[in-house]
Amino acid sequence: MVKLSKEAKQRLQQLFKGGQFAIRWGFIPLVIYLGFKRGADPGMPEPTVLSLLWG
């Protein structure tokens, strides 16, 4: 097993925490963005921000 310095371990921990933060707070907005980019299925009304907020 590779021995890492204390500084390297701290940097890796910060990197993983940053990755977790990005995944937790970025997943839903990414899905919403991709849904808007693709558009509605044929025969369905176009999605709007208001329709997302009010169902």
Swiss-Prot record:
Main location: mitochondrion
Pfam families in UniProt: Tom7
Topology in membrane: Single-pass membrane protein
Keywords: Membrane, Mitochondrion, Mitochondrion outer membrane, Protein transport, Transmembrane, Transmembrane helix, Transport
Function: Required for assembly and stability of the TOM complex. Positive regulator of PRKN translocation to damaged mitochondria. Acts probably by stabilizing PINK1 on the outer membrane of depolarized mitochondria.
Keyword Nuclease belongs to the record: no
Gene: TOMM7
Cytoplasmic topological segments: 1-20
Annotated organism of origin: Sus scrofa
GO cellular component, one term: mitochondrial outer membrane translocase complex
Protein name, per record: Mitochondrial import receptor subunit TOM7 homolog
GO BP: positive regulation of protein targeting to mitochondrion; positive regulation of type 2 mitophagy; protein import into mitochondrial matrix; regulation of protein stability
Upper classification of the organism: Eukaryota, Metazoa, Chordata, Craniata, Vertebrata
Side of membrane Mitochondrial intermembrane, spans: 37-55
UniProt-annotated location(s): Mitochondrion outer membrane
Transmembrane parts of this sequence: 21-36
PANTHER family cross-referenced by the UniProt entry: MITOCHONDRIAL IMPORT RECEPTOR SUBUNIT TOM7 HOMOLOG (PTHR46722:SF1)
